[in-house]
């Protein structure tokens, strides 16, 4: 059996890796952008918090033809897709959001999605919690507070002073407040489906 996958974004990388595990399936993965190995990205891609990219981007706008007023919608043109060009934030929705979606599409409720969240992640701070994973391919980390920029520290202090709750884990069910953002990074380096799923095969 032969399978052609158009686009090596997040879904394309995972699908190609999963299908290629079957020796009876030949997989051809097509991508118009370049392929960089983990950690060998050009400076523009290495900086996770630089959202607007001059290269490796499809140049989409929210309103086609409305230039120069159209809102830029960053979409990665590179193996790994937008997982290479985004800010690496690994933040889940709230359980009630998934339950609401399930009223339109069955199987998207929180209890149905939780096993999948757990399967794909290794949460390096909270992996032992029942709503986190500790054996998945995607590492989840939070910057230690002693490494925060002064602006972030000031924001957090001001929010707590105004009565917002401190939250250590924003991916915990019911989390609401201020605290460290979960990222899919390891040792300060972004991790993506390209290097976690595709490169090993």
Give the positions of each predicted feature.
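Conserved redox-cofactor binding core of oxidoreductases
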Residues: 104-201
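N-terminal glycine-rich phosphate/pyrophosphate-binding loop and immediately adjacent elements
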Residues: 1-118
């Amino acid at each position: 059996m032969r399978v052609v996958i158009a686009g090596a974004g997040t879904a394309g990388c995972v699908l190609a890796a999963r299908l290629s595990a079957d020796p009876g399936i030949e997989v051809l993965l097509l991508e118009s952008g370049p392929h960089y190995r983990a950690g060998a990205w050009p400076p523009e891609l290495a900086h996770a918090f630089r959202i607007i990219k001059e290269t490796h981007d499809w140049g989409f706008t929210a309103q086609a033809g409305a230039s120069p007023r159209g809102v830029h919608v960053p979409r990665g043109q590179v193996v790994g897709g937008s997982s290479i060009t985004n800010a690496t934030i690994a933040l889940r929705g709230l359980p009630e959001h998934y339950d609401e979606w399930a009223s339109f599409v069955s199987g998207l409720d929180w209890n149905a999605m939780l096993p999948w969240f757990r399967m794909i992640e290794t949460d390096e701070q909270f992996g032992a919690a029942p709503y986190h994973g500790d054996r998945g391919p995607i590492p989840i980390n939070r910057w230690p507070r002693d490494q925060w920029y002064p602006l972030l520290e000031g924001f957090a202090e001001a929010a707590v002073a105004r009565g917002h709750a401190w939250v250590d884990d924003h991916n915990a069910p019911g989390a609401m407040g201020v605290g460290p953002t979960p990222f899919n990074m390891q040792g300060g380096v972004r991790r993506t489906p390209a290097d976690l799923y595709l490169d090993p095969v």
